[in-house]
Regions:
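N-terminal nicking endonuclease/strand-transfer module with a His-rich metal-binding environment
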Residues: 1-295
Length: 295
């Protein structure tokens, strides 16, 4: 088993998509590409990917339009470039799964993570949830001498909030004016991710901005907390909550692989330097013996 100098940590990354760019994420998540941005995808492993929920239409946008037509969600008042989808990528480093049973354990873990997503966003608002099991971890594979895969979950969700529609002042019945006419499920990224948890100092005093208004905890950081507490309550142990202030939640798949490759290269360079230190004295001794032989 490979050495593990780093703590196993959970991570939840959040990405925003509009109507014009969600198809790129769909092609990656649903494995519709002929080639992939992430060059570590092993196409023979694609059948091992696990869908906990599949879209009920051919595309994500078609499903959203169908849900709007059925009155399940509202796009009322949104701009053409508004955020319509959130992609939640849930992840724990590779060796956590390798030590706990590999593929089968990862399926159990991410099925429970999918239920967390259902509770957080509402089951009807989850368009797709799929565990990728086809992306090879090159560094772990080389270290262990066998193929090791990086298991993670992609969930595409709709950021929905309940919005009250009021009767207008032009309503003929004066008693109805200003009262609630209907409650709709409005797509709104900004409202869905609005944080109301204040930041405090060590003494518990609220931290204020320059204008005197309170500062609030980042909503993505709160998501990290919620995920960690939910998963540990479901019996999954042996990992920590992702580091506070970490930018890992914003990394794309390609950026993640580049970061991993950099770490792998640094380790390789250190090994080379270590071998060179051993080689130089041996080379010097060999040279000296050759000089003696030639005398």
């Amino acid at each position: 088993m490979a050495k593990n100098n780093k703590a196993d940590m959970s991570c939840a990354r959040v990405k925003k998509y509009t109507a014009s760019d969600v198809s790129k994420a769909e092609r990656h998540n649903e494995r519709k590409n002929e080639t992939y941005e992430n060059m570590n995808v092993i196409e023979e492993r694609i059948p091992y990917n696990v869908h906990f929920k599949k879209p009920f239409t051919p595309t994500y946008m078609e499903q959203l339009k169908q849900m709007e037509a059925d009155g399940m969600v509202s796009l009322r008042g949104l701009r053409k470039d508004a955020t319509l989808f959130n992609e939640i990528v849930i992840d724990v480093n590779t060796m956590y799964f390798e030590r706990n049973g590999g593929y089968e354990y990862a399926k159990q873990f991410y099925e429970e993570a999918y239920h967390f997503i259902e509770e957080k966003f509402g089951a009807d608002n989850v368009i797709s949830a799929v565990m990728h099991a086809d992306e090879i971890n090159v560094a772990a594979t080389e270290e262990l001498g066998k193929e090791v895969y990086h298991y993670h979950l992609h969930a595409m969700v709709l950021p929905v909030v309940e919005k009250e529609i009021l009767w207008s002042k032009r309503c003929k019945d004066p008693e109805l004016r200003g009262t609630v006419k209907a409650v709709v499920n409005q797509i709104s990224h900004s409202k869905k991710w609005k944080s109301d948890i204040p930041l405090t100092d060590e003494k518990g005093n609220p931290l204020l901005r320059k204008n005197g208004k309170p500062m609030f905890r980042a909503s993505y950081s709160i998501l990290q907390d919620e995920l960690f507490h939910y998963m540990t309550e479901q019996g999954f142990k042996g990992f920590q909550r992702g580091e506070y202030g970490s930018t890992a939640e914003h990394l794309t798949s390609l950026q993640y692989q580049i970061q991993q490759d950099k770490e792998r290269l640094e380790k390789l360079q250190k090994r080379i330097q270590k071998e060179q230190v051993k080689y130089e004295p041996a080379r010097h001794i060999s040279k000296t013996l050759n000089e003696i032989d030639s005398m």
